Amino acid sequence: MKDFSVLISIYCKENPLWFREALDCVFAQTVQPAEIVLVEDGPLTPELYGVIDEYSKKYPIFKIVKNETNLGLGLALRNGVLAAKYDILARMDTDDIIPKHRFETQLAKIEEGYDVVSCWSTLFLNEKDNIIAVKTRPEHHDDIVKLAHKRSPVCHAAAFMRKTAVIEAGNYLHRQYYEDYNLWVRMIMKGAKFYNVQESLYDVRTTEAQLNRRAGFSYLKNELEYLIEFYNMGFYTLGDLIKNSSIRIVARLMPNGMREMVFKKIWNHKSAK
């Protein structure tokens, strides 16, 4: 199997215990990365620096990229992509959990010639035994493209990507909460090929605050601007824009309790219970 880089961005509000757990998952993989590109997006806490120092000494494959100020996830990952040595990139977030065979499974698939390979994901609240849902996604490229006309068709944190294809599409841009969806659309329009493994290979940790954060007028305003951008790019039809905007207006402005129920419906979640 080919060498690959793991791409991680971290900022000051990350939980050092969860970060340690995520790194342990990486180093427990059946296939190991040749490089970990860790982007420090602005100054971190002493606790986070301590974890980085400990693991980088134990595993000398870290390439640390330092942003003097917090640039946001999109621009942080943009710098990480440019710094990566290898063409195959494996995304990973700092608070998530993965099974031991994730890298091996996705690496084998991307070596078949795909540009982006992701998978299903399991959403859990705070701790792994508190599963909220399992999020399924279509397997094949044409169905993935169809879903992209409604919402992001790929679990971003679980994605394997080809650096060359990412850069050809313009690399990551600053699109708060839409960094991934924006990139996937541009990659699709450049002819990149997508695949989703039909297995949950990624456990996404969330909190009540994160679930409630994606709501309100400010969030909705940014979201509608990004959807209009997809229309102006020629990816969305006018019908796509009207339908997707209408759904989001309702979802972002409703009470939090109702939003969780709609969240599972709109974003294709299947209850894990």
Task: Indicate residue ranges for each PLM-predicted region.
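Short, well-formed alpha-helical segments that are part of the catalytic scaffolds
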Residues: 13-28
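Conserved donor NDP-sugar-binding/catalytic core segment of glycosyltransferases
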Residues: 101-132
